[in-house]
């Protein structure tokens, strides 16, 4: 649950929209009034939309999926990068590479190339190269790192996208829409809020306004991550309890179950005669015979094959 008030939003300038002549009619439900040629955003709508977006991001973080932050405008890139780093989430703040989402396999190849270049620059082979070759490799590595440095740990498509400016990040929005990835974005009075899933009516140009909204969304994500840790701890505890319960009813290894026939008398069972249980729950006693000292009539002594033959030596 967010704790922001209208006063907090007013102080940050969230309510200030664009010139009324530059408005997008789709933003009409979120506009409170027009003052001196400027549209004023309805902060009640901002709070309700912000709460919905925060709940969504909290659920995504709790599920274990990554949330990609996108902000390439000058006044937003630094604070967005810091927020994403603090949450261990991916971000793109320099330039959106076309196909980052729709051609994710190619982006992964570039990330692997960057990782390989970083390893090579630490090896003896790099040190033995000519200065010109070293400079070329370092320049290519820096270029890739500037663009892809924030998504090195993104091994699969993100669970959600957080966008600061819908118009400036239009390519990222299009790719996410094509793949069905939920989009949370600040929506100023000059944009189409229908392009994203969770528009937050807000000034997307003033740094204090951007910082306030992004920080609030970051807090929701952090809560989701904490819930995920609690869920894991509870699952581990339940598993240990179940294992303990299963071990209580288990027989020691090597122990055999001994059954007694219902047909046997109590006297027979008292002697400890073991029985084999059959499928129909009846049992036959297994008697233990001792060697007889008196030869059985008609039997041959051990070693004699036939009557009259001599015993074998």
Swiss-Prot record:
Comp. bias (Basic and acidic residues): 228-256
Superkingdom of origin: Bacteria
InterPro entries to which the protein is assigned, alphabetical: Ribosomal_uS2, Ribosomal_uS2_bac/mit/plastid, Ribosomal_uS2_CS, Ribosomal_uS2_flav_dom_sf
Pfam families: Ribosomal_S2
Record keyword Methyltransferase present: no
PROSITE patterns to which the protein is assigned, alphabetical: RIBOSOMAL_S2_2
Keywords assigned: Ribonucleoprotein, Ribosomal protein
Location of the region described as Disordered in the Swiss-Prot/TrEMBL record: 228-313
GO molecular function: structural constituent of ribosome
Gene Ontology BP term (one): translation
Presence of the UniProt keyword Ribonucleoprotein in the record: yes
UniProt GO cellular component terms: cytosolic small ribosomal subunit
Family: Belongs to the universal ribosomal protein uS2 family.
NCBIfam families xref list: rpsB_bact (TIGR01011)
Descriptive protein name: Small ribosomal subunit protein uS2
Organism: Amoebophilus asiaticus (strain 5a2)
Gene designation: rpsB
